[in-house]
Amino acid sequence: MTVHCLGNGKVCVYGRGADIFQAFGPEYSSPDAFTLSVCPEGGVNEPAATVKHSRVCFSHTLGSLKMLDLVPPGSSDFYRAVTGNVRFRLTLKNAPVLDLLSPGTAMAVTEPGAIVYATSFENGRPHGYTSNRFRYILIKTDGDVVLRKTSDTELEIAVSGRGLLSVVFSETPEGLFSERPDPEIGNLMFSYLESPPDASPLKHDPRINPARNLPAAANSPFYKEILDGADVICAQQAETGAVLAGYNYHLSYVRDNYGVFRFFLAAGAYENARRLLAFYMSVFERHGRIQNAQGMSESAFHIHENDRVEITGYLVLMFTAYLRATGDTETVRKALPLIKYCLLSQQTELSTCGTLPFNGDETYIAGGLLPRSAIADGSMEATALFHRAITEALSVPFIKEYLGAGAADLLEAAKALIENRFTANFAGENGLFYCNRPLEDPSEAPLFRPGGVRACGHGFGLSFRNKNGDYVCPACLSLDLPPLFPGLYGKRFAVEAALLSPCFTGSQGLIPEGLTAKAAASVRDSLNSRSRIVGFEYGFLMYGQGFDRGLAELMLAQRDRFGAWSEYYDGGNQAGTLCRPWETAVNLAALIEKYPEE
C-alpha cells in the first residue's frame, strides 16, 4: 500500500491508508511516538480511500466513515476529525500511558534513553543513539468519543457520530498544557470534512493548504507534478532545515539532502535551500565533523565507512551552487570552516594513484548492485566528485583566500593527479568504464573502521578486518568465518548507470568523450528489462542524455499516486523505502533543469 507523509517541520506522520505507523514530535529525529490503526473488529475491514489535500492534510473514506488528518502549520499537534462509527487503537511506542487525567484525556512521558536511531538489534532489542530529553504527549478526545485505556501502552478510541482526536507534543509539561488543542481547528476540520472539498471556501485556508513557493518551476508544463513532489519533500523537511530520508531513515543523510537541495535551487525555493545549509553549519559548529547522516535535533550520527569522502564533496557543491544561484556571500562566508574541512578531508584520503575510496552508504553498494568488498577500492564517482568540488571551490576568490596558499596548492595538485590518472584508473577494454579501481595490495585496506556495516551481521559500528578482508565486530574477529564475497574480491565492476552520476554533479568532463552518451543509451534501453533499478536513475539519465518526452512520461509513470518515487524498483514495482525525498527531488530537478533543452 502507498505510504503518505504529513509534516509541518515540527510534527511528522507517516501513514498507509487510514493507519498511521510512525509519528514524530515535537521535532523530527526524535523517538517514534505512536501508531494509530483502525480496529477491524470495529465494523471496518476495507482499505481506506486516501486523498491528499496538502502536505499537512489528508482525508480517508471507508464507506460512510470519513476522516481528516491535519498537522497545522506552526503547531506541535496532530488532529484527526471523524464522522461515523469506528474504533481506533492508539499504541504508544516509547512511553506508558499514564492514568487518564480526566474523561477523554490521557498523557504519556517519553523519558531519556528512548531510541532515536537504532544501529543494531540484539535479542529483539534495539541498540543505538538514544534521546537525552523528556518528551510529553497529551492525547485528548472531544465529541461523540469514548477514550479507554486497554493496556500500559494502548488506548482504545471509540467514535459514534462526530469526534475529534488531538495529540499534542511538547518538551516540557508546561508547554504541553499551554499548547492545548485549538478548538477552532476542530471546527475548521469538520467544516472542511462535511463539505465538498472542491467547493469548500476553506480549500485555500493556509491552515489546511499552506502556500508553496516554487517560482522557477511555475512555467513548467510539469508544474502540477512538481508541486506534488514538493509536498512529499517539504513534509519531510524539519524546522531545523534538514530533510528526512524517509520512514526507515530518521536522520538527515548528506547525499539525500544534496538531491533535495538541487531540487530547491532548480525550483527557486532558496529559503528552503538556505535553511538546509544552515543545518549542516550548525552540526559542524557543535561537533566539528559531518557524518553520513546526523540527527536533526538529537546528537545522533549514522557513521559509515569512509565518511570523509563523497558526502564531503556534495557539501562543497551545495555551498558553491547556492552562492552562484543567490549571490548570498554572507551565508557562504559563515560556512568557510566547514568548506575547508570538507575539502581537506577528501585530500587526506586521496591515494597515490589519484583515487578516493567509496563511502559505505554509496547508492549502488547500499542497494547490493556493488558488493561491500569494493569499499576500499578507488571509486569513480567519489573521485570525480572531489575533482568537481576542488574546481568549484577554488573558482570562488574568497574561498581560495580562506583556504590559504598551502591548502590551495595541495588541492590543485590533487586535481591535477586525478585528471592525469582518471582514464587509466577506470577505463577498461572494449570501451568499458568501471566504477571501481581495485586495490593493488589488499593489505592497504584499513585494519579497522569506526563505523559501517559489519560483515558478521552484528549491526553497525567499530569493525576489524579479518583474514578474508571482511570487517567484523570485535567478538567475531577470531572466528573462522567463510568469505562473505567469494569470487568478488579484487574484481572490477561496470555499472553503466553509475556513469551518469557525474552528469548530475557536473563532473562529466573527466569521462572520455562518447562514453557518457553510450552509457545513457544503454541505460535507457535496459530500463524496462533490468530486475532492479534505483529510483533516481530516471533523473540521472535525463541529466546524461537530455530531455525527451518519452523518458519523462516513463519517469512520471513510476510515481505513486501522491507524487513520490521509491528507493528502488524491482521488476517495475516500488521497493525499498517509499515516499522518498531524494529520488523525488532528483527526478523533478531534472524535469525543471533539462526541459528547455528539448
What are the residue ranges of the model-derived segments?
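Well-ordered alpha-helical scaffold segments within catalytic/enzyme domains
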Residues: 209-217, 258-270, 314-331, 385-402, ...
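Catalytic cores of carbohydrate-active enzymes
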Residues: 290-293, 355-358, 375-380, 384-505, ...
